Amino acid sequence: MLVCTNRPPVSPVLQLCRFASNVVLFHLKIVKQIKFEFLNVFNLKIKRLQMETEVYYGPRDDSFKDFLIKIFKLMDMGSTRSETSNFLNTYINEETLPYFNMAFTSSSANELNNYELFEQMGDSTIGKFIVWSSYEKFPQLRGKPEAVEIVARMKINLGSKDNLSQIAEDLGMWTFISATEEARHRLKKKLLEDVFEALIGVTEYIIYEFTDTNYSQPGLAYQLVYSLLLKLFDPYILKIDYNTLVDSKNRLKGVFDQYKDKLGLQPVYQSERIVKNDKNVFLSKVYDGNGNFLGEGTAPLKKEAEKKASEVAILTLISNGYKKNIPSLYETL
């Protein structure tokens, strides 16, 4: 049985009220969403501001002093326990600890008393050490003009941020570095590198300043720091190997230099951001001067992606008969 019901027509006023109600609800939802997003952004800014202003202070208790003693003991000063104790007490005491504190404090934690002075000293000392110790470790390089390039590469690799920060982290320096929370979050490698250089600088400075002039000798501070650096760098010393000392981009450039009439003056890189395995990475492709594709590589950093692409390009060129003649001094070592 079919039943028909005739609903009365909705009045225009009621329609308008319903429409207005829907509009209000819609705007309330938008306002709520905007408020939610605003609060999220606001909270993130507050958190970042707190990180920018909140300072982490590394411990300066006995653990800090014990760390310094461990470093100074590597210099092997004193043949007896008494001599060693006198050596340590001379350079690690209430008078010198403020200098060590500065060496482990970044400018983000203290604009005035920070590691920048000692970092400058340590940077020059480490650079000199790497050059001289390279000629000491590899006597076959001495007096050879072509060795300049090899030692320069050694200095670049051993004195790099990656290497110095690794040495510092392996020594356990991170916990003692004072800096803002943001700096510690974003600049860990830089802080480790800088403070390692500052540690070397302040060590040399303190030995120079606090050695009794009646017993001191010219260059004593550097001699002791040199012996310290020999031990600190020993696990990281590189062999004289072309593929180890020269990064892939420079090795690829060397191939182009040798075959520039056929390959062009230099490799051409094209890089773009892509999503790979749900991560943003760089995809770098490399071509010769004639537009021929040689290889590609991906990495989080553009520089690393180009290095990976260069490795592939070198293999491609070798398979096509373009192999660089390695300098003879590398081959004899």
Curated annotation (Swiss-Prot):
Domain RNase III: start-end pairs: 81-208
Catalyzed reactions per annotation: Endonucleolytic cleavage to 5'-phosphomonoester
Any one GO BP annotation for this protein: RNA processing
SUPFAM superfamilies referenced in this protein's UniProt entry, alphabetically: dsRNA-binding domain-like (SSF54768), RNase III domain-like (SSF69065)
Protein name (Swiss-Prot/TrEMBL): Putative ribonuclease 3
Enzyme class: hydrolase
Organism, scientific name: Invertebrate iridescent virus 3
Keyword vocabulary terms for this entry: Endonuclease, Hydrolase, Nuclease, RNA-binding
